[in-house]
């Protein structure tokens, strides 16, 4: 079978660390395994435009492997060219860069799987870290030291504690719930969550979280809001000018879910106006982020409030080990014809939705 693997280039960094599996040089650690079984592996980082390496190989690819960190956007146009495509594997978590509805509604017998759970702890830790970076005003403090400066007042005037704050998560699934667990030791005033379904009673009681069923009511109460929801038709552009106007003035917003959940220009304007005190995360749209993306340079009135990074929260070396192994397990199940996938990994099975996290579920 022909397998197309789309990853980022790591250059010298791949030689520095052999466990940097998620790059073109190290190929998820599966290149020799695939070769030994007689499969053809094409590995590339070139994924944009009709002349890209990805587009060159799509027509006869049996399997495409992609990641959320350097996503191969599997669009309607590309799917129409992919006459042999049987399986798409996301090495990581998040299949929003694949046109799942088009696969489902056109009857294409393509399965889409991801390595569920492979990086939930990694992302949850990053969320809490980003909250601390924003609330404690860490970035400009560190920049002072790098620039050989020392002006405590300039930092302290915009630095706060997490203790005593009301913190809300939009989404309380695998990542969102772990964020709530990790926030408990900080002694927040209250933990809130917004989700389409309530947590089990025992799970709510464990973290002391309260469900708020109206998102405008949720953000109006919160000092800190974190987005931990998948990207789909219902969440794309959810954090826009209108919803931001409902936030408590001077709130902090953290988004490690997907960049397109937020309207980039609206977030930047809210930060610059003071409606938001800070915004941080690691997800952008598109990815890699253009050099002129408004989130690169936005600041609050004190020249702070920006805690953006490249998309790496879910691709720590520990996470890469997990999603590389999970990808291999999915492929092995496919090659042997057992198709005994972990149920939580299946997004589409032969074109039919298995998960409730994505899709319209209205095949015509």
Swiss-Prot record:
Keywords: ATP-binding, Cytoplasm, NAD, Nucleotide-binding, Oxidoreductase. Optimum pH is 7.5-8.5. Changing residue 53 to V: In strain: 2.2159 and NCYC 1513. Cu(2+), Hg and p-chloromercuribenzoate are strong inhibitors of enzyme activity and Ca(2+), Mg(2+), Zn(2+), Mn(2+), Cd(2+) and Sn(2+) have no effect on activity indicating a cysteine residue in the protein is essential for enzyme activity or to maintain the proper structure of the enzyme. Nitrite and nitrate inhibit some enzyme activity, however cyanide, azide, thiocyanate and cyanate are strong inhibitors of the enzymatic reaction. The inhibition of cyanide is competitive with formate and reversible. Substrate binds at residues 93, 119. Changing residue 262 to A: Slight increase in substrate affinity for formate but no change in affinity for NAD, 9 degrees Celsius decrease in thermal stability compared to the wild-type, greater stability at a higher pH compared to the wild-type. One of its GO terms (biological process) is methanol oxidation. Changing residue 258 to A: No catalytic activity. Its main location: cytoplasm. Transmembrane segments: none annotated. It is an enzyme of class 1 (oxidoreductase). Changing residue 184 to V: In strain: 2.2159 and NCYC 1513. Disulfide bonds: none annotated. NAD(+) binds at residues 174-175, 195, 230-234, 256, 282, 311-314. It is found in: Cytoplasm. It comes from the Eukaryota. Induction: Expression is strongly induced by methanol, but is completely repressed in the presence of glucose. However, methanol induced expression is equally strong in cells grown on glucose when formate, methylamine or choline is added. No expression is detected in cells grown on glycerol. When formate, methylamine or choline is added to the culture medium of glycerol- or glucose-grown cells, they exhibit an induction of FDH1 expression. Changing residue 311 to A: 2-fold decrease in substrate affinity for formate and 3-fold decrease in substrate affinity for NAD compared to the wild-type. NCBIfam families: PRK07574.1. Homodimer. This is Formate dehydrogenase.
């Amino acid at each position: 079978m022909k397998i197309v693997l789309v990853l980022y280039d790591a250059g010298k960094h791949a030689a520095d660390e052999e466990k940097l599996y998620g790059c073109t040089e190290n190929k998820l650690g599966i290149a020799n395994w695939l070769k030994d079984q007689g499969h053809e592996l094409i590995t590339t980082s070139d994924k944009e435009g009709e002349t890209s390496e990805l587009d060159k190989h799509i027509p006869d690819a049996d399997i495409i492997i992609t990641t959320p960190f350097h996503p191969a956007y599997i669009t309607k146009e590309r799917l129409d060219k992919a006459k042999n495509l049987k399986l798409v594997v996301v090495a990581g978590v998040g299949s929003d860069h694949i046109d799942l509805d088009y696969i489902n509604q056109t009857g294409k017998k393509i399965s889409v799987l991801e390595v569920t759970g492979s990086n939930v702890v990694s992302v949850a830790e990053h969320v809490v870290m980003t909250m601390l970076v924003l609330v404690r005003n860490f970035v400009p403090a560190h920049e002072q030291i790098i620039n050989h400066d020392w002006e405590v007042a300039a930092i302290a005037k915009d630095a706060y504690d997490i203790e005593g704050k009301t913190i809300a998560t939009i989404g309380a699934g695998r990542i969102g719930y772990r964020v709530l667990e990790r926030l408990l030791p900080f002694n927040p005033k209250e933990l809130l969550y917004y989700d389409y379904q309530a947590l089990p009673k025992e799970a709510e009681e464990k973290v002391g979280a309260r469900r708020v069923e109206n998102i405008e009511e949720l953000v109006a109460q919160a000092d800190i809001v974190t987005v931990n929801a998948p990207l789909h038709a219902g969440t794309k552009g959810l954090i826009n000018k209108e919803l931001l106007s409902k936030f408590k003035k001077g709130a902090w917003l953290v988004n490690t879910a997907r960049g397109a959940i937020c309207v980039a220009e609206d977030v930047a304007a809210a930060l610059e106006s003071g409606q938001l005190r800070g915004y941080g995360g690691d997800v952008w749209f598109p990815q890699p982020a253009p050099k002129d993306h408004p989130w690169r340079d936005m600041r609050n009135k004190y020249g702070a409030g920006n805690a953006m990074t490249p998309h790496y929260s879910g691709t720590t070396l520990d996470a890469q080990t997990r999603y590389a192994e999970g990808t291999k397990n999915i492929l092995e199940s496919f090659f042997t014809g057992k198709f005994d996938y972990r149920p939580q990994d299946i997004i589409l099975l032969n074109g039919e939705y298995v998960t409730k996290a994505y899709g319209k579920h209205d095949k015509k």
